[in-house]
């Protein structure tokens, strides 16, 4: 089973894929930035970076977890951007 979460932040597309047996993947603008392999039982974290032309970069952190269904939280520079609250 595959679950996909996505958000566009300041013109950059952030996508997280979660599968039961192939782990989790973080893509930023279509490029793979982090990956966890295998089956995660309770939670996982992924890390990435938004690279801006002017040189300032922003850190991405993804938290995945859940008992029955997978929930996803995406943070940019420690600010929650997905899901919107």
Located regions from the model:
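Terminal leader/tail segments of proteins
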Residues: 1-85
